Amino acid sequence: MKSIEVHTDGSCLGNPGPGGWAALLRYNGREKELAGGEANSTNNRMELMAAIMALETLTEPCQILLHTDSQYVRQGITEWMPGWVRRGWKTSGGDPVKNRELWERLHAATQRHSIEWRWVKGHNGDPDNERVDVLARNQAIAQRGGLATS
């Protein structure tokens, strides 16, 4: 089974507003960057999309170390999801789970992989997190119709 390192991030200019997501996949010294965006989104949706797109890109089962600065994504997939499913996609307070379609898609994308979800503090000097942050922000800027920066 291939061992892949993944770094993800999402960005939103306003919340809601133009959003971007990005992922960096690393395997055997090779890297692949993925990025995209939506004209009207939220930060949480973009964080979810980054993880979804990274996992859906992989064509075979992999051992994955996935770094995210989103506690929403990490806790959602590792802690909250079993309860949501058990309660018919309701939160512990009885409300419908937000972004359910993305959570279902993320859950499906995780099934063939062995994944360790690792939280990294955002904007704290981690070079890979900073890299995907810039990529995601540039996608959000492009969705707004602005010029991306490096």
Swiss-Prot record:
Reaction equations catalysed: Endonucleolytic cleavage to 5'-phosphomonoester
Function: Endonuclease that specifically degrades the RNA of RNA-DNA hybrids.
Domain RNase H type-1, first and last residues per copy: 1-141
Predominant location category: cytoplasm
Database matches in PROSITE patterns: RNASE_H_1
Family, similarity comment: Belongs to the RNase H family.
Domain of life the protein comes from: Bacteria
Assembly with partners or alone: Monomer.
Cofactor remark from the record: Binds 1 Mg(2+) ion per subunit. May bind a second metal ion at a regulatory site, or after substrate binding.
Record GO terms (molecular function): magnesium ion binding; nucleic acid binding; RNA-DNA hybrid ribonuclease activity
UniProt signal peptide: none
Cellular component, GO, one term: cytoplasm
Broad enzyme group: hydrolase
Primary gene name: rnhA
Sequence positions that bind Mg(2+) 1: D9, E47, D69
GO BP term, pick one: DNA replication, removal of RNA primer
EC numbers, comma separated: 3.1.26.4
Protein name, UniProt field: Ribonuclease H
Cofactor dependence: Mg(2+)
Organism, as annotated: Xanthomonas campestris pv. campestris (strain ATCC 33913 / DSM 3586 / NCPPB 528 / LMG 568 / P 25)
Binding site for Mg(2+) 2: D9, D133
Record keywords: Cytoplasm, Endonuclease, Hydrolase, Magnesium, Metal-binding, Nuclease
Pfam families: RNase_H
RNA-binding found in the keyword field: no
Compartment(s): Cytoplasm
